[in-house]
Swiss-Prot record:
UniProt protein name: Lysosomal alpha-mannosidase
Impact when changing residue 916 to H: In MANSA; results in less than 20% of wild-type enzyme activity
This protein's record includes keyword Repeat: no
Binding site for Zn(2+): 72, 74, 196, 446
GO biological process, one term: learning or memory
Taxonomy of the source species: Eukaryota, Metazoa, Chordata, Craniata, Vertebrata
Recorded disease: Mannosidosis, alpha B, lysosomal: A lysosomal storage disease characterized by accumulation of unbranched oligosaccharide chains. This accumulation is expressed histologically as cytoplasmic vacuolation predominantly in the CNS and parenchymatous organs. Depending on the clinical findings at the age of onset, a severe infantile (type I) and a mild juvenile (type II) form of alpha-mannosidosis are recognized.
Glycosylated residues in this chain: 133, 310, 367, 497, 645, 651, 692, 766, 832, 930, 989
Result when mutating residue 352 to P: In MANSA; results in less than 20% of wild-type enzyme activity
Gene: MAN2B1
Mutagenesis or variant effect for residue 72 to L: In MANSA; type II
InterPro entries: Gal_mutarotase_sf_dom, GH38_C, Glyco_hydro/deAcase_b/a-brl, Glyco_hydro_38_C, Glyco_hydro_38_cen, Glyco_hydro_38_cen_sf, Glyco_hydro_38_N, Glyco_hydro_38_N_sf
Cofactor note: Binds 1 zinc ion per subunit.
Reactions accelerated catalytically: Hydrolysis of terminal, non-reducing alpha-D-mannose residues in alpha-D-mannosides
Pfam name, any one: Glyco_hydro38C2
Length: 1011
C-alpha cells in the first residue's frame, strides 16, 4: 500500500539471449543497455565475506547520508499479484514488477558504485525463473558484490496485526529458503525491513531476532510517538521483544526511517513522479543544480539532528518505482557527485549509495548505549482522527479462510513428512504442499489478510487459497491410503460451517476419518449434516459410541438440515476412523428445538455441564451469568451485539471510516436489538441456546459434555446499509469486574501484552478518538481480570478488540462501509456490493487469574490447529498389501507434554524434515500445574513412521546453523545482558524454556508402514 505514488503507464523489457533489443514505451526515454552487453564488462567477482565487508567507505568526521535506492512492490493491493508482476491493468495503477527488475539490473551494471535493495521474494522468485542462465549469473555477481542486497527476504512483507505467528514464520522461511538455495550466504538478509505495515507488533520483533536479523527498520508509527522520539533522539533503539526469553535472544535493534519509505520532497526522480530532474549545465535556462544541492544539504542536516550518530538514511524510491531505473540513478549519480564536491568548500556532508545493512553496520560501529523499548507500536495513527484500527477486522470472511488454510496446510505438511514420497506420488495422483504454502505466504502480505485490498484482489487471494487446497487434498488422500492400508474415495467437505456435505447428506453409510494435528490426544465433537433418520456410529474398535441427530432452528428462510453429532477420540498427530450407518425406523428420533416464549414470570434459562453453567435472562433472551462450577466462580456477564455508526467525514474532521481507518460517529454504539428470540436445544451430547437478534444477526451459545468453555457461534450479515449508515458490528461482554482501565491482548497469537485505556507506555497520549484510539489487534485472545477472576474470549480469526469501560470487553466481528477512507484503495468496504454473510465463533473461559493460562493456552492451540475431517463411502480396495487395514494411527510414540506445541513438521527434501517445537507458556503463567517450567524431550524415537539419523539445530527460519549463527551486539541502558550458555545438542535431551521455539533439520529414514 503506497503513501504517495499513484501511477500511469510504463513498459520495458530486456534482451534474453537473442530475443532482441530493449523496446521503448515512451518516445523520450533513453535506451537502456541490454543485459547481454554487460556480460563482458563485469568486474571479476570476488567472494563476498559473510556480513558487511562489501559496504562502502564512509567519512568519520562528516554527516554520512546513506541513499537507499529501493522499490516497494505490494504483493497485491489495487491489482492482483499477476497484474502487478506482468504490468496488466495499468489503467488501475501503473506497475509492472518484471520491468522494474529488468531495468534495475541493467542500471546496476552500468556503474559499479550503484546499489539497490529488493524485498518481495514472491515477485523476485517468479522473475528469476524466467531469466536465462547468463542473466542469473550476472545477478549472482551483483549479490556477491553487495550491490544488489535483499532486505527482509520473506515471500512478502507481512502484516503485523492480522497475522498468526506460525504463518509469519512459514512465509519468512519460504522466502529465505529461496535466497539460501539461490545465492547461498551471500543472499541472506541482515536487516528486517517493514516499511509499509500499519503498526508493529512485539512478537514480530521477537521472531525477527530469533530468525537471526541484526536490525529492523520500519516506516510507519504514530504521529505523536514520532514527534516525541525526534525530540528525545530515540528514533533508533533496542527493542526487547519478550518478557520470557532471556536477553539478547529477542532483542532487536530497531530504527524509524525519517520519511516513511519515500524520498524527501522534491527529490523523487521516477517516471511516476513530477519532481524536476537535476540540471547541471549553467547555460541551460532550466539550470537547478545549485538550488537542489543546497536544498539537499539543508534537508540532510535537518534530518540528521534527530539521530544520534553521524549517519542518516534517505529512502530513494517508493511504490513500484524504478521501472526506468536509469532515470533514478542518473539523477542520483549527479547528486552524489555535486554534493560531495561541496566538501572542498567546507561542507561536512558526505553522500553515498548504501543499503540498510551497511547503514546498520555504521550504527553498530558507533558503539553507543541505546535505550530499550518493551511494548509495541499499536495502534498507529497518522493524525488526530485517523487511527488505523479498522483493518484489524476488515474482510472477516477472508481472515477466517486464511486461518482455516493455515490449519489445513499444517495437516498437509505433517502427513507429507510422516509418509514421505508416498504422499506425493500415490493412487490419487501427484500431491503437493507447495501451492498452498505459497498461497498462504501471499496471504500474509500487509494488504491481503489485513483486508485492505480492492474487492477483485481479495477475490483473487481467495482463489489462490482454493487452488492450493486441491493438491493438498490429493496429498492427504495418498497419505491416508498409505497409512490406512486401503484406498477409498475421500471427500473433503469444505462447507461444513454452513452444514453442507453431499456425502453425509445422501449416503446410508459412510466412514469419518478425523486427523488431529496436535501433539497430544484430543476429544473432538464431530458435526455432520445428514438426512433425517437414526444413525449408529462405531469407533475404530467397532464399539458403538453415543450419537445424536438434532434438528436446529434456522435464522433465515432456508431449511437447516439435521446434524449428526458424536465425540471422536483422537490420538496425537494421528487419526481415528468412525463408521456411520443409518438404521431404518418408522419414526425418526431427531431432537427438535424448543422455542422459549418471552414471559416476565419465566424462570431463568440455563445450559450446563459438569464444568460450566450459563444462565440467560428470560425477559431479553440474553446471556446474563457464567459460573465455573469447579472453582465456584460466579460472574454476571451480559453479552449482546452493537454497531458503531461509521463516520463519513462530515463532522470536525473529514476522515471517514474505511478499510484501514476505524472512526465511529459517536462513542456510544447502538444495540442491534435489546432482546433476542430464543430456542433451546438439549440432548445428551449438546446444549444450545439459539438467539435471533435481527434478520441479519444471530448467535448460538453452546456447551458440549466435558467442555470447560462456552462457545458462542455468531452469524452476521449481510449488514444493511439502506439507511445510508455504514455499520461496524461488535460483540460486547459487560461484567462488574473492577479492571482499572486495563485489559490484555495477544501478540500474533503468542505472548500477552497489557493494554491501558487512553494510555501509551512511552509518551503522554493526547486521546482524540476515545473508541478507535483504544482498539488493538486480537489475533487469538483478549481478556479482562480483577486479579482474582479472569474472563477470556478466544477468537477464530484476527479481530479488533478493546475494553472501553471497566469490566467490559468487545470484539469487532464485521464491518460494512459506504465511504473510502482516503488511504489509496479508492473503494468503500462494501464486500461485493450486497455485503457478506459471515459466521464465526468466540470461546469464553471463566477462571481464576492464576489458573487461566492453562485453559486459554491449550484451547487457543486447539482452535488454530483443529482436527481435519475427511469422509469416505467405505468399502475401498486394499492398497498397502502386506499390512492389515488400520483404523487408528498416531505419528508419535508418546504424547508431547501439554506445555509443548509441535509448531512445524514438514518435508524439507529427500530424507529430511523440518521440525519446530515450541514451549507455549510464558514465564510465571501457570504455577498450579507447573506448565511454565522448562521441559525436556527425547527426540530420538519420538516419531512412529521414521527414525531420526541426524539432527541439526538452526535459527527459526532454518537458514543458519544455530552453532554458527551470530548477530551484532548492542549496548543498552539497562546494563549488560547475560552471557549465552555454551551450545550443546543432544537429541535425547532437548530442553525448551518458556516461550522458546527450537528449530531442527532432521535427516530421517522412513519405516515400512505396517499394522
Amino acid at each position: 500500500m503506497g503513501a504517495y505514488a499513484r501511477a500511469s503507464g510504463v513498459c520495458a523489457r530486456g534482451c534474453l539471449d537473442s530475443a532482441g533489443p530493449w523496446t521503448m514505451s515512451r518516445a523520450l526515454r533513453p535506451p537502456l543497455p541490454p543485459l547481454c552487453f554487460f556480460l563482458l564488462l563485469l568486474a571479476a567477482a570476488g567472494a563476498r565475506a559473510g556480513g558487511y565487508e562489501t559496504c562502502p567507505t564512509v567519512q568519520p568526521n562528516m554527516l554520512n547520508v546513506h541513499l537507499l535506492p529501493h522499490t516497494h512492490d505490494d504483493v497485491g493491493w489495487l491489482k492482483t499479484v499477476d497484474q502487478y508482476f506482468y504490468g496488466i491493468k495499468n489503467d488501475i495503477q501503473h506497475a509492472g514488477v518484471q520491468y522494474i527488475l529488468d531495468s534495475v539490473i541493467s542500471a546496476l551494471l552500468a556503474d559499479p558504485t550503484r546499489r539497490f535493495i529488493y524485498v518481495e521474494i514472491a515477485f523476485f522468485s517468479r522473475w528469476w525463473h524466467q531469466q536465462t542462465n547468463a542473466t542469473q549469473e550476472v545477478v549472482r555477481d551483483l549479490v556477491r558484490q553487495g550491490r544488489l542486497e535483499f532486505a527482509n527476504g520473506g515471500w512478502v512483507m507481512n502484516d503485523e496485526a492480522a497475522t498468526h505467528y506460525g504463518a509469519i514464520v512459514d512465509q519468512m522461511t519460504l522466502g529465505l529458503r529461496f535466497l539460501e538455495d539461490t545465492f547461498g550466504n551471500d543472499g541472506r538478509p541482515r536487516v528486517a525491513w517493514h516499511i509499509d505495515p500499519f503498526g508493529h507488533s512485539r512478537e514480530q520483533a521477537s521472531l525477527f531476532a530469533q530468525m537471526g536479523f541484526d536490525g529492523f527498520f520500519f516506516g510507519r508509527l504514530d504521529y505523536q510517538d514520532k514527534w516525541v522520539r525526534m525530540q528525545k533522539l530515540e528514533m533508533e533503539q533496542v527493542w526487547r521483544a519478550s518478557t520470557s526469553l532471556k536477553p539478547p535472544t529477542a532483542d532487536l535493534f530497531t530504527g524509524v526511517l525519517p520519511n516513511g519509505y519515500n524520498p524527501p520532497r522534491n527529490l523523487c526522480w521516477d517516471v511516476l513522479c513530477v519532481d524536476q530532474p537535476l540540471v547541471e549545465d549553467p547555460r541551460s535556462p532550466e539550470y537547478n543544480a545549485k538550488e537542489l544541492v543546497d536544498y539537499f544539504l539543508n534537508v540532510a542536516t535537518a534530518q540528521g539532528r534527530y539521530y544520534r550518530t553521524n549517519h542518516t538514511v534517505m529512502t530513494m524510491g517508493s511504490d513500484f518505482q524504478y521501472e526506468n531505473a536509469n532515470m533514478w540513478f542518473k539523477n542520483l549519480d549527479k547528486l552524489i557527485r555535486l554534493v560531495n564536491a561541496q566538501q572542498a568548500k567546507g561542507s561536512s556532508v558526505h553522500v553515498l549509495y548504501s543499503t540498510p545493512a551497511c547503514y546498520l553496520w555504521e550504527l553498530n560501529k558507533a558503539n553507543l548505549t541505546w535505550s530499550v523499548k518493551h511494548d509495541d507500536f499499536f495502534p498507529y495513527a497518522d493524525g488526530p482522527h485517523q487511527f488505523w484500527t479498522g483493518y484489524f477486522s476488515s474482510r472477516p470472511a477472508l481472515k477466517r479462510y486464511e486461518r482455516l488454510s493455515y490449519n489445513f496446510l499444517q495437516v498437509c505438511n505433517q502427513l507429507e513428512a510422516l509418509v514421505g514420497l508416498a504422499a506425493n506420488v500415490g493412487p490419487y495422483g501427484s500431491g503437493d504442499s507447495a501451492p498452498l504454502n505459497e498461497a498462504m505466504a501471499v496471504l500474509q502480505h500487509h494488504d491481503a489478510v489485513s483486508g485492505t485490498s480492492r474487492q477483485h484482489v481479495a477475490n483473487d487471494y481467495a482463489r489462490q487459497l482454493a487452488a492450493g487446497w486441491g493438491p493438498c487434498e490429493v496429498l492427504l488422500s495418498n497419505a491416508l491410503a498409505r497409512l490406512r492400508g486401503f484406498k477409498d474415495h475421500f471427500t473433503f467437505c469444505q462447507q461444513l460451517n454452513i452444514s453442507i456435505c453431499p456425502l453425509s447428506q445422501t449416503a446410508a453409510r459412510f466412514q469419518v476419518i478425523v486427523y488431529n494435528p496436535l501433539g497430544r490426544k484430543v476429544n473432538w465433537m464431530v458435526r455432520l449434516p445428514v438426512s433425517e433418520g437414526v444413525f449408529v456410529v462405531k469407533d475404530p474398535n467397532g464399539r458403538t459410541v453415543p450419537s445424536d441427530v438434532v434438528i436446529f432452528p434456522s435464522s433465515d428462510s432456508q431449511a437447516h438440515p439435521p446434524e449428526l453429532l458424536f465425540s471422536a477420540s483422537l490420538p496425537a498427530l494421528g487419526f481415528s476412523t468412525y463408521s456411520v450407518a443409518q438404521v431404518p425406523r418408522w419414526k425418526p428420533q431427531a431432537r427438535a428445538p424448543q422455542p422459549i416464549p418471552r414471559r416476565s414470570w419465566s424462570p431463568a434459562l440455563t445450559i450446563e455441564n459438569e464444568h460450566i453453567r450459563a444462565t440467560f435472562d428470560p425477559d431479553t433472551g440474553l446471556l446474563m451469568e457464567i459460573m465455573n462450577m469447579n472453582q465456584q466462580l460466579l460472574l454476571p456477564v451480559r453479552q449482546t451485539f452493537f454497531w458503531y455508526n461509521a463516520s463519513i467525514g462530515d463532522n470536525e474532521s473529514d476522515q471517514a471510516s474505511g478499510a484501514y481507518i476505524f472512526r465511529p460517529n459517536q462513542q456510544k454504539p447502538l444495540p442491534v436489538s435489546r432482546w433476542a428470540q430464543i430456542h433451546l436445544v438439549k440432548t445428551p451430547l449438546v446444549q444450545e441456546v439459539h438467539q435471533n437478534f435481527s434478520a441479519w444477526c444471530s448467535q448460538v451459545v453452546r456447551l458440549y459434555p466435558g467442555q470447560r468453555h462456552l462457545e458462542l457461534e455468531w452469524s452476521v450479515g449481510p449488514i444493511p446499509v439502506g439507511d445510508t449508515w455504514g455499520k461496524e458490528v461488535i460483540s460486547r461482554f459487560d461484567t462488574p469486574l473492577e479492571t482499572k482501565g486495563r485489559f490484555y491482548t495477544d501478540s500474533n497469537g503468542r505472548e500477552i501484552l497489557e493494554r491501558r485505556r487512553d494510555y501509551r507506555p512511552t509518551w503522554k497520549l493526547n486521546q482524540t478518538e476515545p473508541v478507535a484510539g483504544n482498539y488493538y489487534p486480537v489475533n487469538t485472545r483478549i481478556y479482562i481480570t480483577d486479579g482474582n477472576m479472569q474472563l477470556t474470549v478466544l477468537t477464530d480469526r484476527s479481530q479488533g478488540g478493546s475494553s472501553l469501560r471497566d469490566g467490559s470487553l468487545e470484539l469487532m466481528v464485521h464491518r460494512r462501509l459506504l465511504k473510502d477512507d482516503g488511504r489509496g484503495v479508492s473503494e468503500p468496504l462494501m464486500e461485493n456490493g450486497s455485503g457478506a454473510w459471515v459466521r464465526g465463533r468466540h470461546l469464553v473461559l471463566l477462571d481464576t487469574a492464576q489458573a487461566a493460562a492453562a485453559g486459554h493456552r491449550l484451547l487457543a492451540e486447539q482452535e488454530v490447529l483443529a482436527p481435519q475431517v475427511v469422509l469416505a463411502p467405505g468399502g475401498g480396495a486394499a492398497y498397502n498389501l502386506g499390512a492389515p487395514p488400520r483404523t487408528q494411527f498416531s505419528g508419535l510414540r508418546r504424547d508431547l507434554p501439554p506445555s509443548v506445541h509441535l509448531l512445524t513438521l514438514a518435508s524439507w527434501g529427500p530424507e529430511m524434515v523440518l521440525l519446530r517445537l515450541e514451549h507455549q507458556f510464558a514465564v510465571g503463567e501457570d504455577s498450579g500445574r507447573n506448565l511454565s517450567a522448562p521441559v525436556t524431550l527425547n527426540l530420538r524415537d519420538l516419531f512412529s513412521t521414521f527414525t531420526i539419523t541426524r539432527l541439526q539445530e538452526t535459527t527459526l527460519v532454518a537458514n543458519q546453523l544455530r552453532e554458527a549463527a551470530s548477530r551484532l551486539k548492542w549496548t543498552t541502558n539497562t546494563g549488560p545482558t547475560p552471557h549465552q550458555t555454551p551450545y550443546q545438542l543432544d537429541p535425547a535431551n532437548i530442553t525448551l524454556e518458556p516461550m522458546e521455539i527450537r528449530t531442527f533439520l532432521a535427516s530421517v529414514q522412513w519405516k515400512e508402514v505396517d499394522g
